[in-house]
Amino acid sequence: SKLLDNLRDAVRKFLTGSSSYDKAVEDFIKELQKSLISADVNVKLVFSLTNKIKERLKNEKPPTYIERREWFIKIVYDELSNLFGGDKEPKVIPDKIPYVIMLVGVQGTGKTTTAGKLAYFYKKKGFKVGLVGADVYRPAALEQLQQLGQQIGVPVYGEPGEKDAVGIAKRGVEKFLSEKMEIIIVDTAGRHGYGEEAALLEEMKNIYEAIKPDEVTLVIDASIGQKAYDLASKFNQASKIGTIIITKMDGTAKGGGALSAVAATGATIKFIGTGEKIDELEVFNPRRFVARILGMGDIETILEKIKEVENYDKMQKKMEEVISGKGKLTLRDVYNQLIALRKMGPLSKLFQLLPGIGMLGQIPEDQLKVGEEKMRKWLAIMNSMTYEELDNPSIIDKSRMRRIALGSGTEIEDVKELIEHYNLMQRTIKMLKRRKKDVEKLLGQFGGEST
């Protein structure tokens, strides 16, 4: 896709560049504005987006272990996703059978091709699909639909030479209903140009009254950019059950403008056409789409890292619960804690990211290496334990230790060391619990409350 190609490079440059953080942020925001405006996104929307990004930068602090640059890209990812529809996940599988979809759109949008792509999409999902050709104004429309139907093995209903579009649509739907088709797609006329929305909507109303579809889908060509706003908003007002398909996303630089314009109306973008082939129609997911624009690998890495930090925070909460007497610490908890730490990066990197630790040079390299090696061994040991052993380490005797050491490729001494570490944690927790009770007792004597 030509859409926002240079943003991927901008993300990479931002994450790996050597300029100061503030300068890098300023440069990236300029690049973002330039890219969005050249993709025909409405200027007001662009500046509203970048203002939100700046506002969040001012008010939000990155979680512990997350670098500022990574957190900035996460904010950009969130706000760009909102620009294109946020967390809206279109419902593509119908909740009833039979299900009638009526396609409308102006001429030249690729509506008939889209009808074929849609039929292929649902056929692949295992539905019995029928196509109705009710575009009576374009001479080759029915012929094109029949060719597509033949290519994908889907029956097509049409009446060559007949000019009554409403009648054709009605008879086609009735025929397929009698044949127990599960999804019926009706291709209607696209004889009106942009700016003639009223006539298009009037025709849509007449066919709608005749066939009572379950869904009306407007097909829009991505190359019209932000002009899609007027068409989509009028369509959205006229048809509350309406969804939208944006075609030709691969062949224009204005796709971003079309997507953001449609999203601004509140209409649901269901699919986007990403090429000419019959299978090049994809369900539109704003977050997945933005991840691809920004560079899927970079975004996934950052999101995964943030998720791991959240997992680690959950582990910390679990420890707090154990100390307060609400829970019990098991080796399974120790395992989850180590996994969360491991995924957040090497120990040296974690020490760098910890706020307030400016003594990195004082932590010997060989000590860090020993820590990494110990972590690796302990994970291997716990992977060789049964669920029963993880949940109740007190049952691990010498013969079990031998089996665990053999299964994990470690020494019995390593297994003993892990068990000793676990027992030390247990003793520490008991001590903390006792202290907590003593403090509460003391506060009680003075009529205070524990916090």
UniProtKB/Swiss-Prot annotation:
Q: Which GO terms describe its biological process?
A: SRP-dependent cotranslational protein targeting to membrane
Q: Where in the cell is it found?
A: Cytoplasm
Question: Where do the TM regions start and end?
Answer: none
Q: Which organism is it from?
A: Acidianus ambivalens
Name the chain's protein.
Signal recognition particle 54 kDa protein
Q: SUPFAM superfamilies, per this entry?
A: Domain of the SRP/SRP receptor G-proteins (SSF47364), P-loop containing nucleoside triphosphate hydrolases (SSF52540), Signal peptide-binding domain (SSF47446)
Endpoints of the signal sequence: none
One Pfam family cited in the UniProt record for this chain: SRP54
- Is Cell inner membrane there in the keyword field? no
The reaction(s) this protein catalyses: GTP + H2O = GDP + phosphate + H(+)
Keywords assigned: Cytoplasm, GTP-binding, Hydrolase, Nucleotide-binding, Ribonucleoprotein, RNA-binding, Signal recognition particle
Name the major location: cytoplasm
Q: Which InterPro entries match?
A: AAA+_ATPase, P-loop_NTPase, Signal_recog_part_SRP54_M_sf, Signal_recog_particl_SRP54_hlx, Signal_recog_particle_SRP54_M, SRP/SRP_N, SRP54, SRP54_GTPase_dom
Q: Which residues form a coiled coil?
A: none
